[in-house]
C-alpha cells in the first residue's frame, strides 16, 4: 500500500529492535528517533524527542493521551545516536540531542519550552534549558495554606527562582482544577 515505506540500512545499531511477542520485532524509541532524523528538521526532531521522553503521546485524530512513564530518556537517545556511527540522519539527530529534555507532560508544555529555550536559529528565545515538571516542596509551615505538600512546575529554572505554568483550558477547566489553581 502507499502508506508502507521500506528502508534499507547496511548495518543496524545495536538494540534497534525489541521483540513485541511471537518474534514480531518493532523499532525501539531510540531507533525511531534516529530514523525520523532523515525526515524532520532539527526543531521538529527535538519536539518528537520531548514527546518520547515525556508522559504524553499525540494522537492522529484527537486529543493527546497520557502515559504512565516515558518511552525513553534524553540520555538513552543521546547514547544510541552517538553509537550509531555512519547511520543516515545521524548528524541531524546528534544536533537535536543537545536540546532534549525529560519529563514533559503535554504537547503544549513541550511547545512552550521549545519556544523559550531553543536557540534563535531554531526558532526559540535562547534561554537556558528549564527543568520540566520540577518538584518544589512546600515548607511544612505553609502546607495548610497551600493545601498540598509539593507543587510540580511545568517549566522551572530553580537557580533563578523562576517557574512558568502553561494553563490549558482543557486541563484546567474542571471545577476541581480551577479551585486548586486559584490557590
Residue ranges and their predicted role:
Residues 1-89, 110-113, 120:
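Short gly/ser-rich loop at a beta-strand->alpha-helix junction or flexible surface loop bordering the NTP-binding
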Residues 67-183:
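Surface segments flanking catalytic/ligand-binding clefts of nucleic-acid enzymes
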Amino acid at each position: 500500500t502507499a502508506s508502507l515505506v521500506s528502508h534499507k540500512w547496511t548495518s543496524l545499531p545495536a538494540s534497534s529492535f525489541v521483540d513485541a511477542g511471537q518474534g514480531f520485532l518493532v523499532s525501539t524509541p531510540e531507533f525511531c528517533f534516529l530514523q525520523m532524523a532523515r525526515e524532520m528538521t532539527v526543531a521538529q526532531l527535538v519536539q518528537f524527542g520531548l514527546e518520547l521522553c515525556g508522559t504524553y503521546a499525540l494522537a492522529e485524530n484527537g486529543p493527546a493521551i497520557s502515559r504512565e512513564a516515558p518511552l525513553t530518556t534524553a540520555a538513552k537517545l543521546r547514547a544510541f545516536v552517538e553509537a550509531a556511527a555512519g547511520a543516515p540522519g545521524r548528524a541531524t539527530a546528534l544536533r537535536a540531542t543537545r536540546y532534549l529534555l525529560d519529563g514533559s507532560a503535554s504537547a503544549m508544555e513541550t511547545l512552550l519550552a521549545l519556544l523559550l529555550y531553543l536557540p534563535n536559529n531554531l526558532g526559540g528565545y535562547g534561554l537556558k534549558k528549564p527543568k520540566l515538571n520540577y518538584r518544589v516542596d512546600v515548607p511544612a509551615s505553609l502546607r495548610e495554606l497551600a493545601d498540598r505538600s509539593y507543587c510540580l512546575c511545568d517549566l522551572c529554572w530553580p537557580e533563578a527562582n523562576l517557574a512558568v505554568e502553561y494553563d490549558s483550558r482543557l486541563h484546567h477547566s474542571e471545577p476541581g482544577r480551577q479551585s486548586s489553581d486559584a490557590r
